[in-house]
């Protein structure tokens, strides 16, 4: 297949050939000297050529079962050959070896080996980020393991370094799925839409992507939009049967569960019709049968419901929901014994099924067995998905009180209608289910997971584990338990054995029956099933319905995880979606990561990566063992059990072939409960369990336990001993010593350190399961992970990055290949395992910063790799003829264009306005050293003005713009300048423009320093803020009535002589206690546009009295040079507030400064965090599944205190002006009734420009539109402003150089391709242009669709999006807005101005 993306470098291939020849000579010399060596595998020239084009971009497109056996064999041979040579070279080979090894293992779906090889490549290659194929492969591996946080980062970086990457559609698809699981629905929709417009091949069809969009609407409870999207999709031609069945199933269940879709009778009628049609398309869907049963049950058709449930059990026995619903029907039919057995089957399959436990408790209570009822209710409350914990707690308390009042012994003497809960497990149906489940699980372990193409697995002889108890043994166990006090020693021994076997059996079932939480949807995701069961009573005249035994499911063709069907287009197939909300299984700790269940026994050892606060990609705590030991055993004993394929995992390849890795012991990553079956290595995709409030917080705490430790702790057994070095986490220093608790926090960059993952957890201290490499060769495993070396010395790694250039201070006990610096702004240069990085990072703005080397150039390698590129297969980026860095910023434009013709693409095709050589931007690390706790509540810089002269005093401007002052409060400004604030009062606004539009945010009234969930049970970061619209007149009415209501409440309090309690709008002293919910709802009027100088002439004129540096328009304001209106930035916006109105946490657009004046009459409370800590807040947002840039969040002050983040906190009174400096993070709450006005300002400083450009690049990485068009602004600045600051001048000149080069290069490419460029000059005040698809700024050359050009609507695309929608640009015209001569003139005339004379004081 045609390769794409990063081209193969001829020069690299030639060098590799020479290296290969040298290596052969060395081996020959070794043999001649008498060394005995085994014959190593070798590749022919033809094989090397065939392997040349294979890399991660073919993942999902190579089918080994379709004439692919030779390819698979070749890849296997290549892997063996590489491993052999690496072993002989003792790991000292070219870094590209490991990258290729990662690609080959990825294509073979050997994920542990692929990850290890990619990690090794990362550790050796300082500019790894230039290799898009590497980043893509790494992202696929993370995606496979549902490590979504890291997969998202890797995929975003691919698109950043290579926007035209040929697998961009695959990336957008996966990003859409991951953001959906993370409940970031806006981002999810954006990426699904980006995938749809891309015409490149993809493993999913467009119809399947459209299904995801429809399901996204359903997840958001936008049911009418979802219904419309589903119905529209049904009209698609050539729709596959599987997709059609899934859509109909969704529509059927939506009509059953959503009240908005009509009255009950109509809804149920439609629901049944849709489900019946779905079953016509896919008769084997157990889930559709289950839904149909629920519909029949709700309308009283009991017989039909039983038939449907029976069909569901036949198709997929392991469904706790189905068994629970059967129990409800039996209970309604007054058949308690049958109901009991059905409920027991449900909780057997899913120990955390709250609904089944509650129904079982109700059953026992109705049979007057309160002790058993209490046990069931307690189990229900322990479930994470219990929605009525308080009600159950009250019921338990009531029943316990009743028991206390009963005469002693009365319960023992009473005949029981039902067996006790302990005895119920050995009843015939549950016991048979237990036995079958154990047998099936055993069978699964011995069966290839061959589900591609809908093939069923071959019959496998049932084997029952020694611990799989038969019904007879279960009965014997209960008898022994009942007579525990009277047993002889032999019987006690037997009891102990049976109990231990019973525990093992339960744990195994819990691991294997994640399917209890799933239902097949045919595609990826489905609706969340309402776990509350039908409450309608069924007439008692219904005939008794015997509970017959269900057929065995061990027959061929039936799989525990329900049958799956392959989708038409490749690796994603029909999968399963959780019924009801995500559940945990009993005492076995389970975390839904994405939708895969990672089960463990109280240990974190079975998750690939763990972290607490890490914002970037993995980084292990590393223990380097002595090279004399067997490092592969010590290092990998425990850390990565979750990476292994285990029985019943859905990690098999397209034909069910398992990767070459060994199978771990009992713990494995299980992909049950997923929305898409894993074919071609893609992990199962997310389901919708969010609609019931159980959003899959997939890696928010990054622990494998539901209640276990929050990180990995070095136990006594796992503590490094002897010749070891423990590597401290470097990106998030909290002051602990290097050997302190090794919680994996900082996970910067892309990869875990491969040198060791030897952090044992208490439960698995002695485990010897294979780790990352799963290699049969321990020496090779050790080499691939990085050999242990004792010559690690201190060193520095000082680098420049395009975001926050930083310097690392020299520290001991550090390891070079740690990617920690990447999380900050520096680029790591991990050339070898002997090099060192650092423990701390300081911002360029700090007094300790310095710029030592650029991108690692000048770094010495302590390990010289032997040139042994055995395959002549190089996946390096194309050779860099002339680095952009070598082009001076001072030559003329003619020299620049001449140089640009030689530059080529420089290996990249990105449009970063920074240097080519800079890696993708990263959030900054928390400043180091951390502030002491007594410095975390600093005083707010405040200036009191007494008269007009004070306001215009030059040092005021300097004080506000000083980067060391994140915020300044200018008190008494309105009085000093005699501003008429009454012009902005509600009364005046109503009189001026009462029908003017107001955006309204509906919020919850809470204390300013707290943010609780709607129930008031826990503090959260998500801030409820739902958008709607109204008019100034209507909001004014609400504002006034709110004030009147408050007065009335205050008077009532006084009249009742109640003690005055703290107002809800002020801070509370009881911050740690539970708040009573629900909270009162309030409305906040925001973003009221005052840009129209005709409507708001008086108001805008009044603001011209302000000092020049805070005015809306001034020569020294960068935003005044944009040349067009940016609403709310270079125009005024008004805010109308009632107490409790919140402006959630944010930084200003593109990190510009902002001005805010309180009109009054009430106060506002402000919370401010310095710019250098935004990376920490970004981490918290990621941890809480919130989008830092676009989400609504309110920081938890306790979290910030623990993370050593300083918070400025102050009150803004009427007439006070708050200056928010560049990049400052802030959030605001109104204390009283007030109005505010605000706008942005861009001081003409290097700091402001630098931060604006950094955010421009970060926005590009995050697929967020930059409101300020920085390229357009930079050219306007060059035209309009004389710059005397050398730093600011150089940054602007760099931007001009970059864009001049890009315009020229693109121009020449279009002319060479025969594409006509049409002149379309800019008009006055014409806004800057953005791509209508990806929203990046488009400068000079606009790609406009033919249709929009003829209609003069001009729908603009960037070059990359244009090529994705039309490969040869035949559907586009190219419009040119600037003549190259004009740009050259601006560039040449922009020179450094002489410094201004210093102002006299």
Curated annotation (Swiss-Prot):
TPR repeats lie at residues 95-128, 132-165, 169-203, 207-240, 245-285, 286-319, 321-353, 355-387. Residues 1095-1258 form the JmjC domain. Zn(2+) binds at residues 1331, 1334, 1358, 1361. Residues 918-931 have a biased composition (Pro residues). One of its GO terms (cellular component) is nucleus. Its main location: nucleus. It is found in: Nucleus. Keywords: Chromatin regulator, Dioxygenase, Iron, Metal-binding, Methylation, Nucleus, Oxidoreductase, Phosphoprotein, Repeat, TPR repeat, Zinc. The modification Omega-N-methylarginine is found at residues 519, 549. Residues 1046-1063 have a biased composition (Basic and acidic residues). GO terms for biological process: cellular response to angiotensin; cellular response to endothelin; cellular response to hypoxia; cellular response to transforming growth factor beta stimulus; cellular response to vitamin D; chromatin remodeling; circulatory system development; embryonic organ development. GO terms for molecular function: chromatin DNA binding; histone H3K27me2/H3K27me3 demethylase activity; identical protein binding; metal ion binding; RNA polymerase II cis-regulatory region sequence-specific DNA binding. Residues 1-1095 are annotated as: Interaction with SUPT6H. Its EC number is 1.14.11.68. Belongs to the UTX family. Histone demethylase that specifically demethylates 'Lys-27' of histone H3, thereby playing a central role in histone code. Demethylates trimethylated and dimethylated but not monomethylated H3 'Lys-27'. Plays a central role in regulation of posterior development, by regulating HOX gene expression. Demethylation of 'Lys-27' of histone H3 is concomitant with methylation of 'Lys-4' of histone H3, and regulates the recruitment of the PRC1 complex and monoubiquitination of histone H2A. This is Lysine-specific demethylase 6A. The lineage of its organism: Eukaryota, Metazoa, Chordata, Craniata, Vertebrata.
